[in-house]
């Protein structure tokens, strides 16, 4: 019954490709219009119960789904809906019950990813605890394994990459002056978060575990923490955005650009070798974390980021002519990746275009920055770019990512982007006879 209800929903929810288009997420409606989507659920009561007041408007991210909500929530479908809710609830909480529950509940996801067995209990417990106390663990990790010296060094790298980007924007030959000016304003207002935050959020002071001898369980403690987290999250509704707030913990190997805040974030855990090390050459560091830094800056000007202004508001600051030029260049990037074979499947160029644009801009800008250093080695730059994308994965997992991930496969990120840069051919002696050769007129350059 749960699967039957899922089938009722599936035709009306966005695909991964549609979800990758941020512009279609913003569909503001008056609250009175929103609550009329269905007479089967009291949407007014649900929303006001969450935020404690009645909003003027609601941003509907998936309007097609809501258009069909009354067709889905019928009296005939109620038994299916009930089963679906029960299954969703059990699956979401099973990891906090017995070890047998934890292992059984992961069967479906393990099949999708090609994983043979459940994560060991001790490791799962670590991830559960570190996930719950993520900012606390991140603070410890950042101070112990990264430190102030590396933090200051990386902050200087970020500022240098921003300067390179600013110079490129000012010298850009396909943007008009009005769009250039707006782009530089956005760049000048870019927020930077490196390493770890200056303080742990006050929310974590409220997390008090009740031990087993006092009647506490893993599930009961988790539910209390979840309620506190949701209360904290909804308390921020309709208040000014705090751009200094960290959303990702410092012990996470990742980096990102937040288009709604115009902020770039580099947690301490990604600021380690091979991405970055004080023991590596400057060229290796620029081919690693330098390219990642510039990649995140590039997201401010990719097909999604370009839609938002310096404050993170959806606001078209492009002239029509410049936007058409950009869209044509983005289409060239789509075509470069679309249909590339991988893991018995093919890359979706449209799904991955924003990340591919960011990779291209990041690699190119990082190389320009590397050239200003006295110990320049373009070979080390490209070799470390390839090194940071080393990956081990089952074919089933790779096939899953082809369907849902906005990133191209790691191997293709390593090997396709360098082909767009002339220095790659000069450094490694690539000629028309080599498989990695790409004719000059086919090399994609945007930023």
Regions found by a protein language model. Give the residues of each.
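Noncatalytic, helix-rich "gating/capping" subdomain that lines the substrate-entry/channel surface
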Residues: 1-160, 197
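Intrinsically disordered, low-complexity linker/terminal regions across diverse proteins
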Residues: 28, 37-40, 49-52, 59-66, ...
């Amino acid at each position: 019954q749960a699967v039957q209800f899922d089938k009722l929903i599936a035709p009306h929810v966005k695909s991964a490709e549609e979800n990758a288009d941020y512009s279609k997420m913003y569909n503001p409606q008056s609250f009175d219009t929103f609550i009329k989507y269905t007479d089967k659920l009291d949407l007014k009561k649900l929303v006001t119960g969450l935020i404690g007041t009645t909003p003027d408007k609601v941003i509907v991210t998936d309007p097609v789904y809501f258009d069909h909500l009354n067709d889905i929530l019928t009296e005939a479908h109620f038994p299916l809906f009930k089963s679906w809710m029960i299954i969703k609830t059990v699956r979401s909480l099973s990891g906090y019950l017995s070890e047998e529950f934890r292992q059984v509940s992961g069967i479906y996801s393990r099949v999708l990813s090609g994983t043979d067995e459940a994560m060991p209990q001790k490791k799962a417990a670590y991830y559960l605890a570190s996930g719950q106390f993520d900012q606390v663990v991140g603070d410890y990790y950042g101070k112990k394994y990264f430190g102030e010296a590396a933090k200051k060094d990386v902050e200087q790298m970020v500022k240098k990459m921003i300067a390179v980007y600013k110079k490129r924007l000012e010298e850009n030959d396909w943007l008009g002056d009005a769009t250039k000016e707006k782009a530089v304003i956005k760049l000048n207002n870019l927020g930077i978060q490196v390493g770890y935050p200056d303080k742990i959020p006050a929310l974590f002071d409220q997390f008090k575990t009740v031990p087993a001898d006092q009647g506490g369980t893993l599930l009961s403690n988790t539910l209390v923490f979840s309620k506190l987290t949701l209360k904290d999250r909804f308390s921020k509704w309709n208040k000014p955005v705090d751009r200094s707030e960290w959303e990702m913990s410092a012990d996470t190997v990742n980096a990102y650009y937040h288009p709604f805040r115009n902020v770039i974030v580099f947690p301490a855990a990604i600021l380690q070798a091979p991405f970055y090390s004080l023991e590596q050459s400057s060229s290796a560091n620029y081919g690693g974390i330098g390219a990642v830094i510039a990649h995140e800056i590039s997201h401010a000007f990719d097909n999604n980021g370009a839609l938002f202004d310096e404050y993170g508001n959806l606001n078209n600051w492009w002239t029509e002519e410049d936007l058409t030029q950009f869209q044509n260049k983005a289409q060239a990037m789509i075509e470069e990746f679309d249909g590339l074979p991988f893991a018995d499947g093919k890359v979706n160029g449209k799904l991955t275009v924003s990340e591919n644009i960011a990779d291209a801009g990041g690699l190119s800008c990082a190389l320009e920055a590397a050239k200003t250093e006295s110990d320049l080695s373009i070979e080390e730059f490209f070799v470390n770019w390839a090194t940071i994308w080393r990956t081990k994965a089952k074919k089933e997992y790779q096939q899953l990512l082809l369907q849902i991930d906005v990133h191209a496969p790691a191997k293709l990120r390593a090997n396709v982007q360098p082909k767009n840069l002339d220095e790659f051919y000069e450094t490694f002696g690539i000629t028309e006879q080599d498989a990695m050769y790409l004719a000059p007129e086919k090399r994609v350059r945007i930023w």
